[in-house]
Amino acid sequence: MKRNKIVSILLLVAMTFSIVLTGCGDKKTTEAPTSSPGPTTQETSATNEQSGKATRYTSKETPFVTLNGELKKYESPFYLTSVGQSADVSMLDALMKKVGAEYTYNATAKASDLKDVKTVIIATGASSKGLGAAGISAEDEKARASELLEYCKENDITVIMAHLGGVSRRGKLSDEFADMVLEYSSGIVMVEDGNDDGKFTDFASRKNIPITLINTIADCIEPLKIIVGK
């Protein structure tokens, strides 16, 4: 009898010990794991650089930003034309009218049209439809642009490049037209979406010319007022 009592006590102790161990194990499995800290600002910047995307400067709250200097008033008379014959030049024409600018507009202007002009604003961006409507080929457009740009250089006419079509005005032909104009430009105004790869900000930095980035086409109003002195 005494022996059976001892066995019962030992079994009770063993069961109690097992319950304690099980409880401890359950507690460990229900504890929330420690979360890893989020990326630091430096890590985020490094990720953006590795992804190949340029830093974003504009937003709804900051509609335009000028890098590499200040946006300023340029000398008149002004002339507005296109290289690439996209519809962007028509939108820029409407914006120029809206700010009350005094200027001459001809999307297919030739060098001979620029007599006495001091500042040329060139809307860049290729459009096969626009080229077709103008009755000219891409090669014809390049030849016209080259002649016009050389005339500007020889006669001290300031060239401002306007790239307002965003990503839709990027691509092989559009970039070829843009590259032609960039080499003669004293300033750039562009919708920032078209600079996702940093092409234009990198160029402006290398050449040390001001580039004004705008959030949307509508945000071009204030920069244009400054450029034309309105």
Name what the model sees in each region:
Residues 170-192:
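Short, electropositive alpha-helical surface patch
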Residues 132-156, 204-211:
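A short, gly/pro- and small-residue-rich
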Residues 96-116:
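A short, well-structured beta->alpha microelement
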Residues 6, 20-42:
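Bacterial lipoprotein signal-peptidase II cleavage site
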Residues 1-10:
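Bacterial N-terminal signal peptides that target proteins for export
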Residues 71-98:
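Short, charged N-terminal beta->alpha structural module
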